[in-house]
Design a protein with these regions (language model features):
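Flexible, glycine- and charge-enriched loops at secondary-structure boundaries
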Residues: 19-22, 61, 101
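Substrate-recognition element of Asp-dependent hydrolases with the DxDx(T/V) motif
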Residues: 86-103, 108-133
Length: 133
């Protein structure tokens, strides 16, 4: 008997053009951090490198630790520690604006709601590369 349904979020329940989302997300992030001395290209390259470090992470450390260790190699430990709150602020306040690059899928929302009404447990899976907010 099926008791639970697992859905992939990005690109399945949440329609998105990965390139469009990435460009929009980086534009927002770069605009937030430019006043603090972050040149956009270097910042974007460093975030990509941090993302690669998370993907390669074997579980020996958290993805967050993997990301910040790689970030520190470019910007240094002192600047990284000092500026972490800027990133937290970005994800708490500005990141929501990136939702324009992932439009709502009403059919997906209806499907999930119907499955829940029918008593199924519904789980959403995604790659945890963004911080929890």
């Amino acid at each position: 008997m099926i008791k639970a349904i697992l859905f992939d979020l990005d690109g399945t329940l949440l329609p998105m053009d990965q390139d469009e989302f990435t460009k929009g997300y980086f534009k927002l992030l770069a605009a937030k951090l430019a006043p603090y001395g972050y040149e956009p290209k270097t910042l974007i390259d460093t975030v990509w490198a941090g993302t690669a470090a998370m993907v390669k992470n074997t579980g020996a450390q958290t993805n967050e630790t993997a990301f910040w260790e790689r970030f520190s190699r470019t910007y240094g430990a002192e600047k990284t520690e000092r500026d972490k709150p800027l990133f937290e602020e970005f994800y708490a306040d500005d990141f929501q604006r990136a939702s324009v690059f992932c439009p709502r899928n009403d059919k997906a929302a209806e499907t999930v709601a119907k499955l829940q009404r029918l008593g199924y447990r519904v789980a959403l899976a995604t790659n945890p590369i963004f911080p929890s907010i």
